């Protein structure tokens, strides 16, 4: 589980201005290092099984999944991995705002095209970050579930796996969107983002149950919006699957402090 400092009005800011790219604005910050630690933990998953397609989702809206997915994608690109970040939250897309690009064409353009031979490169954009490409959501459709569960979507991901080292997908909250359940089952893994004092425990538990029901590999979970020892406190940890966590806390004077022990 990765822990991030509490921010005010995170969701409204994200919807209006896009996710905050702290890994670009302040790459030497503690929080940027936390995002790099998440990247490292994902890399560890490659030991037993190749992990090239991952999704970030949450139980409910406003957990911060778009911020986490964007910043982790940047750290992957900074590490030299050719990465593409896809905004597949077709209900509340934010990627175009994050990178300040047009959303007139995007994922939905590809999925609704009558020509199955439409070149994905015609709607994939450069992010301005070396090694990172982005595919915005495109116009919001009336049928997101049908589009994302289509064979066209599965084929698109398979094609992108051949072109990129990492395919990162920002998905709608799993309890709000049936398409998230369907799509995660075809990916190498899913990371669940949880926002402290916002995400209800019962909702998080149900989200995990749904992922397990669809046999979606759960790579871990990220805890967001956490107060750690006051206003200057930060924390980091990473949970493997559901029910195990460890971490370190960071502050102005104290560099490391245990926050979590093993959960049984």
Regions found by a protein language model. Name each.
Residues 1-264:
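P-loop NTP-binding module
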